[in-house]
Amino acid sequence: TVMAVGKKAMMMHGKTHEHIKTIIPLRDGVIADFYAAEIMIREFIKMIPWKNTIINYSYRMVIGIPSGITEVEMRAVHDSAEQAGAKEVKLIHEPMAAALGIGIDVLDNTGNMIVDIGGGTTEVAVIALGGIISNKSIRIGGTELNEDIQDYMRRAHNLSIGERTAERIKIDVGAAIPNIENPPEPIEVNGRDIITGIPRSVHVNHEEIAHAIDKTISKIEDTVISALENTPPELSADILQNGVYLTGGSSLLRGLDKRLSSRIKLKVQLGEDPLLAVARGTSVALKNFNKFPFLI
């Protein structure tokens, strides 16, 4: 029996008893549990407000995938969508979806660089003429940052915290650099003392978190540099002019744009509503199901 899906299920994560199990169907941007992924898609379909719509079960579906995905992983995404009831399925690489989602004309001959930092992967791509010219994909994203924070809390404060608490810390006081304008107030974090086993709280500030996630942010920067090194000169000129666009939930980390800009010596800007960029772009692709040449 499925009790909850999405946010409601996430609220239960780490709090369940033996008769309830929370499952994360996707890991590192790909399907980790085929059956759970199929159920999740089915439940999401049920959430669609079908008002003023003739209910038609021959669904068309567009799904975002990491650009570094294997053929087998791609097939798994395709199959799970079909098992959930989709009749026509197309896949879109997430950097392409992110570009569409922030309003870039991806069919134009001007090159644009997208850095999409999702939950399981970071995608860096140079896009022009409806294609991905140069791309790098690493299986590092928001989840890895949460793990860094959990690890730091264990080492620095002898405090064991759950994944959801780490996510809240990242959102409330997360920063990519210690020196930021308008720093957030320190927050109180509750967890379990590793030595005594008793619940305890500590205060955590943005400087601590900047230190905790520093190595992972450096890996993301290295990936951006690697993609720039593989970009043709004509497109490099476009990127110099247009800058680099950041999308994805973890791009909202305070000071990340400034840190990346000082490392690559290019203008770095946050895309509009970066958290929903890929979802919005996938929606644009769905409306152009048979028009866009880059849908797989």
Set out the residue ranges of the language-model regions:
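Nucleotide/phosphate-binding catalytic cleft detector across ATP-hydrolyzing
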Residues: T1-I117, A125-Y245, S251-I296
